[in-house]
């Protein structure tokens, strides 16, 4: 049996790779594998398929003899935050993060509020194999009610991270991308005193992430300029990521957020060994400038679970990804886009500086180009020998190195594509090398796939 888990749980197109039956069995498997009788916390984003999958998972949990509590539509970080605070035995978030509406996913958390480790993934898959003959009709339909009191604990927790600080007088635009951030992002900023303009704020599972949010910044850039705002923040579908935009439309991605936030902690002498954690996607300009001010950047594979593992190992206080997924000790590394946004806003207010000026004081990024090579197969589902051959092919291209030039290639953990990152000091070299590698790699992968 091929693993159903990718870099961030289980993900796929609803009713094709991710079915009602699979969700039911995952709920059952988690229920069987939990070590306590405390309820399992479940939530979802706004996708149309979300409620169907919630019903399947909750029935599976009940079939295993365990109870669940339904949080409703919520940001993903609400699940691990509340697991830790309220002592749930585990949690499930139904979301495909930044992916289009037809996708959905299952993110699973253990009783510590952490993404489950490989050992538990294997245990769940083993239970799934033995649960193939489990009959859905044996179990009655489950009553599903939202728990608003728990959600309020989460939002109050975010507000409390600000202490006595506020955002009075700040004009801020938020793009909630028809997703989880629609539940609370605007109200949290308003309670902190900000003058808020919010766009794409309907809970619409057919529009989630479409031409909006952290992967499409044109709408928020336009709204910032039209409203003469100080800054803006654009979230992804489940609000665990955020990208900032200054008053002139310049983008503050995860690298910039890590550098600016990290530098504040460095100056306050709070960073363990002056270290922050990022991934192999992090910009060389970021790393080189961070080193110049006395910092150490530790890189991991792409994925917040790898960042979290490195944070624990290095005893770091801050880590994240260029995509805007930031993990901070402030909320026990729950990876919360709304938390990141209010903290960045707080620093600007506290320092009496515009986000534009703060960005200018950071680093000059090297030009990067990220290209996707479409695969006619899912990398994780192919035979081991083919996988090794493709990995060798990828490695041969990844080893292309010149002065101040970097190539990083990886299979997507959520989509049937290879992601090719090329980085160099000038755009011409980036474009030339990217075109060459993409063409050659596409040809080789196509030839390999014809032998399947």
Curated annotation (Swiss-Prot):
Q: Describe cofactor binding as the record notes it.
A: Binds 1 Mg(2+) ion per subunit.
Q: Which domain of life is it from?
A: Bacteria
Cofactor dependency: Mg(2+)
Question: Describe its PTM?
Answer: Activated by phosphorylation.
Q: Which reaction does it catalyse?
A: alpha-D-glucosamine 1-phosphate = D-glucosamine 6-phosphate
What is one cellular component GO term in this UniProt entry? cytosol
* Gene Ontology biological process terms in this record: carbohydrate metabolic process; peptidoglycan biosynthetic process; UDP-N-acetylglucosamine biosynthetic process
Q: Which GO terms describe its molecular function?
A: magnesium ion binding; phosphoglucosamine mutase activity; phosphomannomutase activity
- Give the annotated active site: 97 (phosphoserine intermediate)
Which positions does the record annotate as the modified residue Phosphoserine? 97
* EC number, UniProt record: 5.4.2.10
Q: Record's InterPro entries?
A: A-D-PHexomutase_a/b/a-I, A-D-PHexomutase_a/b/a-I/II/III, A-D-PHexomutase_a/b/a-II, A-D-PHexomutase_a/b/a-III, A-D-PHexomutase_C, A-D-PHexomutase_C_sf, A-D-PHexomutase_CS, Alpha-D-phosphohexomutase_SF
Q: Does the keyword Isomerase apply?
A: yes
**Entry's family note:** Belongs to the phosphohexose mutase family.
Instruction: Write out the function statement from the record.
Output: Catalyzes the conversion of glucosamine-6-phosphate to glucosamine-1-phosphate.
This chain's protein is named Phosphoglucosamine mutase
Native species: Prochlorococcus marinus subsp. pastoris (strain CCMP1986 / NIES-2087 / MED4)
């Amino acid at each position: 049996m091929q693993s159903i888990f990718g870099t961030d749980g289980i993900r796929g197109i609803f009713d094709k790779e991710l079915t009602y039956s699979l969700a039911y069995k995952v709920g059952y498997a988690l229920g069987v594998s939990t070590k306590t009788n405390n309820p399992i916390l479940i939530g979802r984003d706004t996708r149309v398929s979300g409620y169907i999958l919630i019903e399947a998972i909750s029935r599976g949990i009940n079939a295993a003899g365990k109870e669940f509590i339904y949080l409703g539509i919520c940001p993903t970080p609400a699940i691990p935050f509340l697991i830790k605070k309220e002592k749930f035995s585990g949690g499930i978030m139904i979301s495909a993060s930044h992916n289009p509406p037809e996708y959905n996913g299952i993110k699973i958390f253990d009783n510590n509020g952490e993404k489950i480790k490989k050992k538990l993934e294997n245990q769940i898959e083993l239970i799934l194999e033995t649960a193939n003959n489990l009959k859905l009709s044996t179990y009655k339909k489950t009553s599903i009610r939202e728990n608003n009191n728990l959600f309020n604990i989460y939002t109050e927790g975010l507000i409390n991270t600000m202490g006595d600080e506020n955002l009075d007088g700040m004009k801020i635009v938020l793009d909630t991308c028809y997703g989880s951030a629609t539940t609370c992002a605007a109200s949290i900023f308003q309670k902190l005193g900000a003058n808020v303009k919010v766009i794409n704020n309907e809970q619409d599972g057919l529009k989630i992430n479409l031409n909006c949010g952290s992967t499409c910044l044109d709408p928020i850039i336009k709204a910032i300029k039209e409203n003469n705002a100080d800054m803006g923040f654009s979230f992804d579908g489940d609000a665990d990521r955020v990208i900032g935009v200054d008053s002139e439309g310049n983008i503050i991605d995860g690298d910039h957020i890590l550098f600016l936030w990290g530098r504040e902690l460095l100056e306050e002498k709070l960073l363990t060994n002056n270290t922050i954690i990022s991934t192999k996607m992090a910009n060389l300009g970021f790393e080189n400038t961070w080193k110049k001010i006395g910092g150490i950047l530790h890189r991991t594979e792409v994925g917040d679970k790898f960042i979290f593992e490195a944070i624990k190992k290095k005893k770091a206080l801050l880590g994240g990804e260029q995509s805007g997924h930031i993990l901070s000790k402030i909320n026990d590394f729950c990876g919360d886009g709304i938390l990141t946004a209010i903290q960045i806003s707080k620093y600007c207010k506290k320092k009496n500086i515009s986000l534009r000026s703060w960005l200018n004081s950071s680093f000059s990024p090297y030009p990067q180009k990220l290209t996707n090579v479409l695969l006619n197969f899912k990398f994780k589902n192919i035979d081991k020998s083919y996988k090794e051959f493709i990995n060798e092919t990828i490695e041969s291209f990844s080893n292309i190195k010149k002065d101040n030039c970097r190539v990083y290639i990886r299979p997507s953990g959520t989509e049937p594509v290879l992601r090719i990152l090329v980085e160099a000091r000038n755009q011409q070299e980036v474009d030339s090398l990217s075109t060459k590698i993409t063409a050659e790699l596409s040809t080789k992968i196509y030839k390999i796939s014809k032998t399947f």
